[in-house]
Amino acid sequence: MADLVFFYGTLMTGFDRRRRVGIDTKLRYQGRGWINAALFDLGLYPAAVPASDGRVWGEVFELLEPSTVLPALDEVEGYRPTETDASLYVRAQVPVHLPDGTTAAAWVYFYNAPLGRAPQIASGDYLEYLKVH
């Protein structure tokens, strides 16, 4: 089975961040999907936190080189596997719901710091949210 990653923020298509991180050619787009989570606006980027009753929409990519892409993503997201308490985001494997009704396990980065007064993005769709804000 393929290694998958789910992006819900500035690593999605339409942003330049994947190219700047140097992973754009090491991913293969698989389509849109959603995870059970809640989405918040932190200003420059969004934050997802697990929520069984919420939906966060994003994009699913196959990792063509997991051994290089995951460490690069860990660094960008501030995830320290040996120091999760000190990590800005933590990486977890969760079910992602695909358009054909199936689910697949994908890596996702959940926010791991206080949300403060960050407003919730009710639609769970960061791209849609940016169009109206």
Which residue stretches match the model-derived regions?
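Glycine-aromatic micro-motifs
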Residues: 1-133
